Amino acid sequence: PPPPPPLELSSAASEVYKRQSPHYVLDTNLVGTLNSLEFARKRCGNMIFLSTSRVYSVTAQRAIPLREEPKRLSIDTAATLPEGLSGNGISETFDTAQFRSIYGATKLASELFVQEYCAMYNLRALINRCGVIAGPGQWGKVDQGVYTLWVAAHYFGQQLSYTGFGGTGKQVRDLMHPDDLFALLE
């Protein structure tokens, strides 16, 4: 049987790296993807690439019409919504053309490399834009692992702190455990 496809998930996991060392982010994300693509091209002909929701435009995300509810913010579906946005959230057709971040730019460039390899070398690939993945091995540090920080705050009876949207804590993010992601990809 053919070997299983490599799972390419090169990423500078810490926000500190993303801000202080663009070279490190570029080497890790883009060069890591290129190395994985070459392996897949020469060895098995397919791969799975885990990208990120950070490829979507920050400007477009900030312009999402929101409705404040008692316990959360929701997409205001009564407003005119841009392409790729619905009451279910953001799809793969949402804006990627405007400002995103150095990290998001390298992951979007990696997606383009994957598409080019598929066209040039008949590589078969799956690109999955993950949101927040949290589980074993994630550390409760200021520069990564916000959910781990929240669990620790709850455990030790400390106040939670929120960033953005007026610090209300009403913003909503999907959280995926690595086991669930693995089951999805299987």
Q: What is each model feature region?
A:
Residues 18-24, 58-62, 139:
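Conserved catalytic-core motifs of eukaryotic protein kinase domains, centered on the activation segment
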Residues 18-31, 99:
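Short alpha-helical oligomerization interface
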